[in-house]
Amino acid sequence: GDWNKVMQEWDDFTLESYMTFTKSWLSEAQRILKPTGSMWIFGTYHNIGVINVMCQMLGIEIINEVIWYKKNAFPNLAGRRLTASHETILWCNKGGKKREYYFDYEYSKSGDFSYDGLKAPGKQMRTVWDISNNKEKCELEYGKHPTQKPIRILKRMIKLASREGDIMLTPFSGSGSECVAAKIMGRKYIGIELDNSYCEIAINRLAHVDETEEQFGQLHLELFESAVAK
């Protein structure tokens, strides 16, 4: 299936070519990022080390390393290693002497995180997030991507690091989950994706965001939202 395709494409990278690729897109992300903005980067043990090192080489500051714990992780069918049950998320800013990036600290303490098994109400948010990887039916209605992220985690990240009306760029948008979350949250969005089939899925999802929002029980836009297809 698609996951096998993803792994095949990963195997086609040499370490040198992956480092070159990573430097290329990170440099551009750093160039266009406003001093008041920040970026979130998902990764696994396959690539997060290279991304971390490249951020340091480019002068990109890593604000936090977040561990997304998945208690419902996919089982290890081969039985040859431990079951992977987390992803790493790097939260980064442009770098430099001034730290101007936006952070909604009050939301991080007092927002509604009832879906997170570790977040204590009214307490500072920590760097381990216990959030199910299950997707709602409305998230899969128009198709799916092998590394598709649940809307609930994306909305959290968007709210923590941006204001309503801000512009969000997703350079590897897949089936458009980040764009959908951004639109729900009232942000402007730009999404980039090479695969035409995923672009079509993203376009369909974005066209039905009102239905998605209603199914999530979010009929008002007071907490989070923006990202795009083409």
Language-model segments: residues:
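Core catalytic lobe of class I
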Residues: G1-E200
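S-adenosyl-L-methionine
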Residues: I203-K230
